[in-house]
């Protein structure tokens, strides 16, 4: 089944939904390994700059949801909704402690008048961080947070697009080591597991994608947007955080490159795509 999205439309967005980080993020957010403690003041500052890029710099209408101290991971809004065109799938996150995060997101997306589909099957789990939409098709990572039933419900929700599953063993999510860096361009990390996942995606797809290989898996998570007044825009990790990967992004001469710091969220496994959900609302003409 061929996807219907046209490359000139891929990456278009009018709105972004974000959520402020709670202080409980520092001690109680889920993390794969215990490492450095999160500097909350710095995390807040980095998040505010991130939101500022989306709103002030790129002109998106930013819907800012408030922090909830009882939901330490609530800043990572990507995991609780998958939006494609006019439809929003409200997910069932793999971690039980995150299930209540969906309520406020559902309310926000209803206000934006999207068609809401809720994942109510108690056997299904899906984190948005495991969902890579290429503009032509979906790849869904099967991880500790996302299962086959979750992928099936996503396929039922977005019937116009092919959906393929990719095993994710060594990372939290599929997008912990890849993302879209352009209409036909997959950014991918250099680790063995990242390269193995890419090979599976290439085998599953009828389409041939270009690839942008970066040395650091975490830095392969970037945000591509197609902003009419700006052209191709790419938010990527800073040279201070990932110098070698930043050099690779700097070779993209037809993109407006915006380095964004994310050191604090990364301590609790949060990457750039994790902190926003993008919506492209059609204007009434």
Curated annotation (Swiss-Prot):
PTM annotation (Phosphoserine): residues: 33
Gene it is expressed from: Ddah1
Modified residues (N-acetylalanine): 2
Role according to the record: Hydrolyzes N(G),N(G)-dimethyl-L-arginine (ADMA) and N(G)-monomethyl-L-arginine (MMA) which act as inhibitors of NOS. Has therefore a role in the regulation of nitric oxide generation.
Catalytic reaction list: N(omega),N(omega)-dimethyl-L-arginine + H2O = dimethylamine + L-citrulline; N(omega)-methyl-L-arginine + H2O = L-citrulline + methylamine
S-nitrosocysteine PTM positions: 222, 274
Regulation: Inhibited by zinc ions.
Entry's family note: Belongs to the DDAH family.
Binding-site residues, Zn(2+): 274
Record PANTHER family: DIMETHYLARGININE DIMETHYLAMINOHYDROLASE, N(G),N(G)-DIMETHYLARGININE DIMETHYLAMINOHYDROLASE 1
Molecular function via GO: amino acid binding; dimethylargininase activity; metal ion binding
Name of protein: N(G),N(G)-dimethylarginine dimethylaminohydrolase 1
Subunit organization: Monomer.
BP GO terms, sorted: arginine catabolic process; arginine metabolic process; citrulline metabolic process; negative regulation of cell population proliferation; negative regulation of cellular response to hypoxia; negative regulation of vascular permeability; positive regulation of angiogenesis; positive regulation of nitric oxide biosynthetic process
Entry-linked Pfam families: DDAH_eukar
Binding positions (substrate): 30, 73, 78-79, 98, 145, 268
Entry's EC annotation: 3.5.3.18
Active site: 173 (proton donor), 274 (nucleophile)
Alphabetically ordered keywords of this record: Acetylation, Hydrolase, Metal-binding, Phosphoprotein, S-nitrosylation, Zinc
């Amino acid at each position: 089944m061929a996807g219907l999205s046209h490359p000139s439309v891929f990456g278009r967005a009018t709105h972004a939904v974000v959520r402020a980080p709670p202080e409980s993020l520092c001690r109680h957010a889920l993390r794969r390994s215990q490492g450095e403690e999160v500097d909350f003041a710095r995390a807040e500052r980095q998040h505010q700059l991130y939101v500022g890029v989306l709103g002030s710099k790129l002109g998106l209408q930013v819907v800012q949801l408030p922090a909830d101290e009882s939901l330490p991971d609530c800043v990572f809004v990507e995991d609780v909704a998958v939006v494609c065109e006019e439809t929003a799938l409200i997910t069932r996150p793999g971690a039980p402690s995150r299930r209540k995060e969906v309520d406020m997101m559902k309310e926000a997306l209803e206000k934006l008048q999207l068609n809401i589909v809720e994942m109510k099957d108690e056997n299904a789990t899906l984190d948005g961080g495991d969902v890579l939409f290429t503009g032509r098709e979906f790849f869904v990572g099967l991880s500790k947070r996302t299962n086959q039933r979750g992928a099936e419900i996503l396929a039922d929700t977005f019937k116009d697009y092919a959906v393929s599953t990719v095993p994710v063993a060594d990372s939290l999510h599929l997008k912990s080591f890849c993302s879209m860096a352009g209409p036909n361009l997959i950014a991918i990390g250099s680790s063995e597991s990242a390269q193995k996942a890419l090979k599976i995606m290439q085998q599953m797809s009828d389409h041939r994608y270009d690839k942008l290989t970066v040395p650091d898996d975490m830095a392969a998570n970037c945000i591509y947007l197609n902003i009419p007044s700006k052209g191709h825009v790419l938010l990527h990790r800073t040279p201070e955080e990932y110098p070698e990967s930043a050099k690779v992004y700097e070779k993209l001469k037809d993109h407006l490159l915006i380095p964004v710091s994310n050191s604090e969220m990364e301590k609790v496994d949060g990457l750039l795509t994790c902190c926003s959900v993008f919506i492209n609302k059609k204007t009434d003409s």
